[in-house]
Design a protein with these regions (language model features):
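Acidic, glycine-rich active-site loops and adjacent beta-strand->loop/helix elements
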Residues: 150-151, 182-184
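Residue-level detector of alpha-helix initiation sites
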Residues: 33, 184-185
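Active-site entrance/lid segments in N-terminal catalytic domains of soluble metabolic enzymes
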Residues: 2-177
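Conserved active-site-proximal phosphate/metal-binding subdomains
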Residues: 158-179, 185-339
């Protein structure tokens, strides 16, 4: 083992122990993409796969977890959206299958959800978009945090990964394992965040074009062709409708989302829907638009959620090779620093 590999192993030890994987690299949960095939491939290759529950019903999640278990006996997790109207039922499905790790995304854990997850012995991971929230989540009993910057694909916050990492890691990384996400495409960046105290990292965009990913060939081609500047954040058109920005490749669906926002804002105005229902309508819009892109391969009208690291995705390759490349780059970077 080289000096770089030895250093990398040492820096990833905490994340590896927490996840039960061989390397502290999680595959970010991406709706329609992060299903049994990619999740199992990720865990089988030594990383940590996450099922994206998204808008799934409890029955669908039940089948997806069971399906994943037929493809891997390694640990994997499930990512749940906090605003899902059947969140507690989804947590029960995870418990039934003894899922080892549950990620809650999209806001603070609703009352009772945290206890329900922990009661079944699962480890709970939450997103911390600010230091104050990170501290609050730790006090409430969360087992680990993901710090994700605005470079990420899909739903994003307003602050960059590098700034969030500098703000949050020195303050909380000794209390709980912290995984850094957003805009990571190479191992050198992984090494940098590990040096700052991260327990590991989470990448999504980098794994979309994995051979094992079921994303449509057109969807993968769009990623391989795209550069960082093509992955743009959606614009909020009505301040009364608090829509979380979404980063995706520019196409016709970018425009249709603006129209959808106007339509939902009007329904709010006319008192035809409550705020919670309005936000759910937006989420269902994304679920449908993503399906169009990922599954149907309609890259003009479907959503192409992608992070700014998309320019570093240059070909289709197996998950194991992507992980090996990232680990080699990270080890090389740490070796150079030792010199």
């Amino acid at each position: 083992m080289s000096i770089g590999q030895e250093r990398l192993k040492r820096r990833m030890a905490r994340g590896v122990e927490f996840l039960g994987s061989e390397v502290a690299i999680m595959c970010g949960a991406m709706s329609w993409v992060s299903e049994r095939n990619l999740v199992a491939a990720m865990s089988n290759a030594g990383g940590f796969g996450l099922i994206a529950c998204g808008a799934m019903t409890p029955e669908l999640l039940d089948a997806e977890i069971a399906g994943t278990k037929t493809l891997t006996n390694k640990p994997f997790g499930v990512n749940l959206i906090t605003m899902h109207p059947m969140l507690m039922d989804l947590i029960a499905v995870c418990a039934k299958h003894q899922v080892s790790h549950v990620v809650l995304a999209g806001g603070l854990p609703p009352a009772g959800s945290l206890d329900a997850i922990k009661a079944n012995g699962a480890k709970l991971i939450c997103f911390a978009p600010a230091l104050s929230l990170a501290k609050k989540l730790i006090r409430s009993g969360v087992d680990a945090l993901v710090v994700e910057g605005m470079e990420a694909g899909g739903h994003i916050g307003p602050v960059s990964t590098s700034v969030l990492a500098q703000e949050i890691l020195p303050e909380v990384s000794e209390q709980v394992p912290v995984f850094v996400a957003g805009g990571i495409g190479r191992g050198e960046a992984i090494a940098g965040y590990l040096d700052q105290g991260a327990a590991g990292v989470q990448l999504g965009t980098r794994f979309v074009c994995a051979t094992e990913s079921i994303a449509h060939p057109n969807f993968k081609k769009a990623f391989i062709r795209a550069s960082a500047r093509d992955a743009v954040a959606s614009v909020q058109i009505d301040p009364r409708l608090p829509v979380i920005p979404v980063r995706a490749l520019k196409n016709a669906s970018t425009e249709s989302f603006t129209a959808k926002q106007r339509e939902v804002a009007q329904l709010l105005d006319e008192g035809k829907v409550e705020m919670m229902e309005a936000q759910l309508q937006i989420e269902h819009y994304w679920a449908g638009a993503l399906r169009k892109g990922v599954i149907d391969g309609d890259v003009d009208n479907g959503s192409l959620m992608a992070g700014q690291s998309v320019g570093m995705v240059t070909r289709e390759e197996p998950v194991a090779e992507i992980i090996a490349t990232l680990m080699a780059e990270a080890a090389h970077a740490l070796e150079k620093r030792a010199a």
